[in-house]
Amino acid sequence: MGSFSIWHWLIVLVIVALVFGTKKLRNIGSDLGGAVKGFKEGMKDANSDKPAEQVTQQKVADDTIDVQAKEKTNS
């Protein structure tokens, strides 16, 4: 019941290859590799010395409405 031997893993690999097919497994492998590459590039960009662009927020006076809230009284 402990660890699996190499024969167990080979049988599992053969069953997976029969179920999914080698072309599908190749596509999954290339997609996974692309995802890892993109993650590494993203981490490299995050650690770079470039300062982040400042996002400026423009206030539009026409869209601002000044209101006062009043408490509702039961009469």
Curated annotation (Swiss-Prot):
GO terms for biological process: protein transport by the Tat complex. The chain crosses the membrane at residues 1-21. Keywords: Cell inner membrane, Cell membrane, Membrane, Protein transport, Translocation, Transmembrane, Transmembrane helix, Transport. Pfam families: TatA_B_E. Residues 44-75 are annotated as: Disordered. It is a single-pass membrane protein. It is found in: Cell inner membrane. Signal peptide: none annotated. One of its GO terms (cellular component) is TAT protein transport complex. GO terms for molecular function: protein transmembrane transporter activity. It comes from the Bacteria. The Tat system comprises two distinct complexes: a TatABC complex, containing multiple copies of TatA, TatB and TatC subunits, and a separate TatA complex, containing only TatA subunits. Substrates initially bind to the TatABC complex, which probably triggers association of the separate TatA complex to form the active translocon. Belongs to the TatA/E family. Part of the twin-arginine translocation (Tat) system that transports large folded proteins containing a characteristic twin-arginine motif in their signal peptide across membranes. TatA could form the protein-conducting channel of the Tat system. HAMAP family: TatA_E. NCBIfam families: PRK02958.1, tatAE. This is Sec-independent protein translocase protein TatA. It comes from Bordetella petrii (strain ATCC BAA-461 / DSM 12804 / CCUG 43448). The lineage of its organism: Bacteria, Pseudomonadati, Pseudomonadota, Betaproteobacteria, Burkholderiales.
